[in-house]
Curated annotation (Swiss-Prot):
The gene is arz1. GO terms for biological process: establishment of cell polarity. Keywords: Cytoplasm, Guanine-nucleotide releasing factor, Nucleus. This is GTPase-GDP dissociation stimulator arz1. The keyword Cytoplasm applies. It comes from Schizosaccharomyces pombe (strain 972 / ATCC 24843).
Amino acid sequence: MTASDTVYLFQSLADRSKNPQERSLFRNYISEALELLRETPSSPTVVHEQCFRFLANSCSDNNENRAAFFNLGGIDVLKPYCSKDNEYSALAFAVIHNCILDSREYRAQVADAQILNLAITYWIDWQHKLKAPFFNMLSFVCEMLYPFCKDCSLVFMGLQLLPSMVREGIDPFTIFAKAFDNSLVCVSFAQNPSMLIDSIDLVRNMPDFTKKTDMLNLFPRIAEHDAVLSTSLHADPQFLDFLESCFRSDDSNSITMASLFIGNLVRRDDIAKQLMQKDFLNMLISCIMQEKDVDGNVERVYACCAALRHFMIPVSSRAHFAPTAILLQEKLASSRFTQLHYISASMIRLSMPYILCELADHPERFYKLKDWSKSPDFNLALESNRTLLGFVKHYLTVPKSKEKISAFFKNNINLFEESVVTVLSTESKYPIVIGEAVFVAILMIKHGYANVAQTIIASPVYEALKSYRDDPNLAYQLKQNVRSLLVLVEHR
């Protein structure tokens, strides 16, 4: 067969394999195409071009052809083309793109062959010469391979393409979100603080683009991976200095990103204690209290509040933070955004029992919780009712509560009873919350507040409790507590 015959054959095969119904008919030609490509000439010819076209079309949405391609060592054949600095590299990447487009199994094989590194390098070198379809194709290759990446340097390399992505209308967030979902990449970043800082700066220093805020907020996801908390990132002086510089800046996006990072790092008790010794707490509080336009900068304020709330999760630190929770309530209550009301209610809930006197002395703070407990926002209403239940629990379990707390409790007994019933009405998919309400209801009845029992029997909650008692999806201890409550209710 002459060279022209070979060109004609593979051109014909490439054209016909555009038809999904015919692709399987040409499977035997995959080995021949790879054989022609195996000897990579310094200047590929039209024969090579048609072989690439045939492989790309025949492996599109055809698992049997893809299997043949990989079994015949197709990636090893194409890899030298991917590393060449010419237009044929784009055709080789097109074949790879079609082979892995909807196949997770083959993506892992391709990732092991360092194709992601080659794709990014080729994009960097050819970004001013490629046409739009090839940009889209390379972006999909990166997006599909980042979940299998093990080295943060490949993310750093990819971020250097942000100007090209923005210029070509490609959404970088979709691509890099896959990388930050990858625990190996995130641990790699945590072990390389300098590269992490440089990567953040690549995004920060970009002129504004549509997803800039979202892109910056990908970096705190690093600390969402539990494995990262076992690294020394939280103790790295360079990284902590960098976060501090973000708080000192006037850049709202940087402050938000730094707050989210701190919040995710302090999920572990010992890290929270270490970072409490730094000045980050005062930075977070100052950022919130000095904010003149809460609603105009709601993302920044929320991020700071969320970080503070994470500091409060360890029981050992709650007494320290209780005054802060009360201090912030008025500021956050001024917002029209219910997510800020929610986080305020949550911080107050975690501050029990250290603020019972404060709530009794300043009933306007308490009645703000009452208002929130009736909010149409389900999450806000539920969290506020949980906070009211927290007041009851700590009042009834703390020995010798002060008289003013006792008087305050009795004056608002109807509200507390209402909260018990409201929370007990919650769907069983919130077992922890239901458990809290069951426990508080038992406490109230045992302390002589029998009206709770009457309220429960007179409401649909009574039937719900009986269904919880025998629900196989609920924990044994919760069902036992429900049974105890029903006994108390039915014998009043």
